[in-house]
């Protein structure tokens, strides 16, 4: 944040027991612009100073050097700073204009690696809306991670192993056909999977058949392995089409199968440390002494087959050895919370202090008309279908608003896909939310297209002028610009908070706030009037576009030049 150094130093002159860094981290934006431009809360000082926060705030204001600020006031437990508007406008606009997309970058991460386990669809099943959250939250966090100076490693831990493949192989051999699969691979494989579960309700022995085929696959049976490879290859083709549409790439596609030859090492280490206990023929790690409410971690079943826990432990060890991560994030639904608590507990018992660097980035559910989706029942909402429908809705609105726009199809794809991504990310990560596509793709309201349209509007203004913009004399005196200036000023702090809280919605909500501030200004101002402040106003418009474009990029959303 521009001018924060002055605020931090002024506070530090009074609060000598706090470091500059500690003060800087406490600064925040007031709830309303009427309260000031930057706020310093005093709650955490009450304990050490043995005073009520309101009194502490009043004491700070009485002692602080107010030179360089419009005013500094105490409002309850907050010290609120009102910045010098002309000087701050000049500083903020010059900084954004000069740095462009690098505005908001910081070097906190110092290049340290952060692995991000994300997306992870299951082979032989289509990508559904159920995969959207892990995919887009993971991608946005990777972008935010990089913006904060870290080196993200995006890992698509494919669900390409497990008892479900035994079930699928059995179903294919029992009532499937090669010709049917080749004609429509994923849809046919999904149909077999659903049919298997329907038949297994009437005949439980089918589950034994499925387990037996999976055991064959684990033991290297040639036919089982050939069918598994075929199912995997067909699935990856379809996944790649979806990822291309979302403009998402990965650094690794190492899925569950990759760790088949790495699990014995985990079992050996557990045995060496006397952590394995036999329970009803299975091998477990007892965690009750760590937390009495924690169920045992299952390592091997009674038939010798390995379990997800064994594989995830092997993956954690491999990732630490390969990437030496500073943090390892797992973007997985909130219902898996206990699994990650168990995994970290087992790694800790094994003596790996870096288990504390593993974080479960939990998220809530997407529902459609209040209903959760289930692949087993077959009532699944396909991500491809949603992206197709979003494209059509976006195209319809573009044709109405701008019939002469060139390459409408490309723009409609960027707007439609962007709308779906933005809507997911503007919701707090851990919240559940209901999905209504028509609301999501609207060009007004709290939507991705609204932010994209605002950015395109700013770019359109800049195309209408031949003025060569400079960063000289950016002293805007129009009070109508102040909301935009303070919002632009908050962007670097917003980027930091999004990383610290692992919360992409902070960026999405910021982009909406900046869009609203700009559109209010646009509706009430003559931006292109030829006067001495024309350059400053145009630099303001360009700065808005720079920061909106960067905000959208961090979220994984395109920023069309025109809409």
Curated annotation (Swiss-Prot):
Keywords: Aminoacyl-tRNA synthetase, ATP-binding, Cytoplasm, Ligase, Nucleotide-binding, Protein biosynthesis. It comes from the Bacteria. It is an enzyme of class 6 (ligase). A motif ('HIGH' region) lies at residues 121-131. SUPFAM superfamilies: Anticodon-binding domain of a subclass of class I aminoacyl-tRNA synthetases, Arginyl-tRNA synthetase (ArgRS), N-terminal 'additional' domain, Nucleotidylyl transferase. One of its GO terms (molecular function) is arginine-tRNA ligase activity. Belongs to the class-I aminoacyl-tRNA synthetase family. HAMAP family: Arg_tRNA_synth. Monomer. This is Arginine--tRNA ligase. It comes from Leuconostoc mesenteroides subsp. mesenteroides (strain ATCC 8293 / DSM 20343 / BCRC 11652 / CCM 1803 / JCM 6124 / NCDO 523 / NBRC 100496 / NCIMB 8023 / NCTC 12954 / NRRL B-1118 / 37Y). The gene is argS.
């Amino acid at each position: 944040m521009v001018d924060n150094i002055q605020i931090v130093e002024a506070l530090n002159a009074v609060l000598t027991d706090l470091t500059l860094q500690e003060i800087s981290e406490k600064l925040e934006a007031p709830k309303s612009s009427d309260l000031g431009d930057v706020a310093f809360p005093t709650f955490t000082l009450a304990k050490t100073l043995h005073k009520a926060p309101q009194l502490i705030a009043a004491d700070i204001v009485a002692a602080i050097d107010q030179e360089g600020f419009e005013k500094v006031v105490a409002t309850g437990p907050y010290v609120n700073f009102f910045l010098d508007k002309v000087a701050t406008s000049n500083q903020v606009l010059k900084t954004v204009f000069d740095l462009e997309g690098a505005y908001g970058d910081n070097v906190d991460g110092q290049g340290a690696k952060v692995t991000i386990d994300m997306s992870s669809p299951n082979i032989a099943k289509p990508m559904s809306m159920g995969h959207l959250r892990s995919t887009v939250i993971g991608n946005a966090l990777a972008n935010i991670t990089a913006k904060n100076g870290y080196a993200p490693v995006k890992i698509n831990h494919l669900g390409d192993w497990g008892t479900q493949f035994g079930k699928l192989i059995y179903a294919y051999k029992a009532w499937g056909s090669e010709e049917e699969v080749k004609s429509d691979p994923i849809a046919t494989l999904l149909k077999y999977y659903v049919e298997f579960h329907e038949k297994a309700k009437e005949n439980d022995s089918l589950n034994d058949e499925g387990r037996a085929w999976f055991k064959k696959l684990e033991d290297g049976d040639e036919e089982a392995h050939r069918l598994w490879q075929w199912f995997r290859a067909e699935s990856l083709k379809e996944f790649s089409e979806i990822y291309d549409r979302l403009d998402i790439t990965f650094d690794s596609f190492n899925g569950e199968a990759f760790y088949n030859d790495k699990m014995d090492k985990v079992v050996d280490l557990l045995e060496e440390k006397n952590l394995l206990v036999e329970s009803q023929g299975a091998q477990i790690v007892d965690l009750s002494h760590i937390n009495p409410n924690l169920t045992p971690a299952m390592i091997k079943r009674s038939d010798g087959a390995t379990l997800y826990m064994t594989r995830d432990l092997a993956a954690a060890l491999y990732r630490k050895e390969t990437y030496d991560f500073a943090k390892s994030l797992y973007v997985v639904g909130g219902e898996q919370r206990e699994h990650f608590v168990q995994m970290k507990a087992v790694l800790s018992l094994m003596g790996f202090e870096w288990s504390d660097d593993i974080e479960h980035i939990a998220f809530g559910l997407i529902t459609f008309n209040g209903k959760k989706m289930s692949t087993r029942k077959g009532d699944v909402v396909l991500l491809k279908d949603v992206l197709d429908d979003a494209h059509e809705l976006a195209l319809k609105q573009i044709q109405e608003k701008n019939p002469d726009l060139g390459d409408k199809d490309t723009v409609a794809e960027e707007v439609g896909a962007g709308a779906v991504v933005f809507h997911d990310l503007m919701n707090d990560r851990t919240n559940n939310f209901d999905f209504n596509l028509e609301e999501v793709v609207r060009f007004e309201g709290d939507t991705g297209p609204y932010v994209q349209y605002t950015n395109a509007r700013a770019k359109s203004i800049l195309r209408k002028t031949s003025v060569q913009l400079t960063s000289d004399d950016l002293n805007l005196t129009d009070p109508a610009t102040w909301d935009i200036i303070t919002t632009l000023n908050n962007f670097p702090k917003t980027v930091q908070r999004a990383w610290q809280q692992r919360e992409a919605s902070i960026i999405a909500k910021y982009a909406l706030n900046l869009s609203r501030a700009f559109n209010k200004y646009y509706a009430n101002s003559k931006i292109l009037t030829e006067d001495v402040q024309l350059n400053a106003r145009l630099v303001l418009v360009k700065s808005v576009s720079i920061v909106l474009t960067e905000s959208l990029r961090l979220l994984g959303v395109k920023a069309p030049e025109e809409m």
